[in-house]
Swiss-Prot record:
E.C. designation(s): 2.1.1.41
GO biological process: ergosterol biosynthetic process; methylation
Protein name: Sterol 24-C-methyltransferase
Organism: Yarrowia lipolytica (strain CLIB 122 / E 150) (Yeast)
Keyword Transferase (UniProt): yes
Catalytic activity: zymosterol + S-adenosyl-L-methionine = fecosterol + S-adenosyl-L-homocysteine + H(+)
InterPro entries in UniProt: Erg6_SMT_methyltransf, Methyltransf_11, MeTrfase_SMT, SAM-dependent_MTases_sf, Sterol_MeTrfase_C
Pfam families documented for this protein: Methyltransf_11, Sterol_MT_C
């Protein structure tokens, strides 16, 4: 697909006002079901409509091309509305690092999460004092962990005001000062000058780009010559067959449940990196091997891998049984008016995502951790 995508109009003032209306001025300090129940009902309805309007039938074979094109053209609005709706659920189930990890026997969930972040920083060679950009930083869990691990100064870029506020709050509470900061912005059209950063990384975030060349070209632009870009990319693997209806349904379930305009295959990511000028120094699908503990085990609810009391809580929430409990509780709260309309619909989309992520993982059709480490040549600007 061409990278000639119409960029979203920037309306930072309007975005901030909408986030304040939806979440409240102190919403970033609330957690779990309390945060879900505190949303403004009118703003929640607008967010639900804004997210679901470009999704058609559940069966991808019945989807019109116009639906997909609409999502691609509305990439910024789609992603902003998605994270306005799901951030509280993500934190409730997963913590402050919104990504999957490799797991080893005897390793607790939080330990694996931190190691996965450390591994990326290690492969990139991030050093103390470097100025590093985290593209699509979520609420800043990885940024804070990598800052601790490396001593680098991290700038988190995020187009969702609610997540920027939450990340800023967590970093202030944890005493990071100026070492970890957050900036509102669209990663398809960053507001940073050319050659601003020593290194750039993205953890399962650039999948929200309408086309990968667009976001990769912006990363290339803001990276200093000789700088390194590391990414855990979500891609469909070489095993994925677009002509296979089962494969298409799995892909569509992942797209809809995770707010993704369009999923691409591994080869598309490779070509996109090369086309914008990067030299790929390392690439590996970290989910390709038959690991004893699969990356999707928290969603599959495989209790035999639980290693700690914290894991019991986490897997209790992320497993299918835990998700069903959450969905029904949210549905009941919605019926009696304590949760905004559309809350259960959001949990249903997240459930669809979880089921298809597990299916995609088991069939080796999808990976959330296609690792690329690429470098901007010294003579390129």
């Amino acid at each position: 697909m061409s990278s000639n995508i119409k960029l979203a109009q920037k309306d930072y003032k309007g975005d901030k006002e909408f986030a304040a209306a939806l979440h409240g001025k102190e919403g970033h300090k609330k957690h779990g079901l309390g945060a879900v129940m505190s949303k403004n009902k009118d703003a929640q309805a607008a967010a639900v409509e804004g997210f679901f309007r470009n999704w058609g039938d559940k069966d991808r074979s019945k989807i019109e091309d116009a639906d997909e094109q609409g999502r691609i053209e509305d990439y910024a609005g789609l992603t902003k509305h998605y994270y306005n709706l799901v951030t509280d659920f993500y934190e409730y189930g997963w913590g402050s690092s919104f990504h999957f990890s490799r797991y080893y026997k005897g390793e607790a969930f939080r330990q694996a999460t931190a190691r996965h972040e450390h591994y990326l920083a290690y492969k990139m060679g991030i050093q103390p004092g470097m100025k590093v950009l985290d593209v699509g930083c979520g609420v800043g869990g990885p940024a804070r962990e990598i800052a601790r691990f490396t001593g680098a100064n991290i700038v988190g870029l995020n187009n969702n005001d609610y997540q920027v506020e939450r990340g800023t709050h967590y970093s202030e509470v944890q005493g990071f000062g100026d070492q970890v900061t957050y900036v509102k912005g669209d990663f398809m059209q960053m507001d940073f000058p050319d050659n601003s950063f020593d290194a750039v990384y993205a953890i399962e975030a650039t999948v929200h780009a309408p086309v990968l060349e667009g976001v990769y070209s912006e990363i290339f632009r803001v990276l200093k010559p000789g700088g390194v870009f590391g990414v855990y990319e979500w891609v469909m693997t070489d095993e994925y067959d677009e002509s296979n209806p089962e494969h298409r349904d799995i892909c569509y379930g992942i797209e809809k449940g995770d707010g993704i305009p369009k999923m691409y295959k591994r080869e598309v990511a490779v070509k996109a990196l090369e086309n914008v000028g990067f030299d790929i120094e390392y690439q590996e699908d970290l989910a390709a091997d038959d690991a004893e503990v699969p990356w999707y085990y928290p969603l599959a609810g495989e209790w035999k891998y639980v290693q700690s009391l914290n894991d019991i809580v986490t897997i209790g929430r992320t497993s299918r049984l835990g998700r069903m409990v959450t969905m029904n509780v949210i549905g009941a709260l919605e019926k009696i008016g304590l949760a905004p309309q559309g809350s259960r619909q959001v949990t249903e989309a997240l459930e669809d995502a979880a089921v298809n992520l597990v299916a995609g993982g088991k069939k080796k059709l999808f990976t959330p951790m296609m690792l690329f480490v690429s470098r901007k040549p010294e003579d390129k600007n």
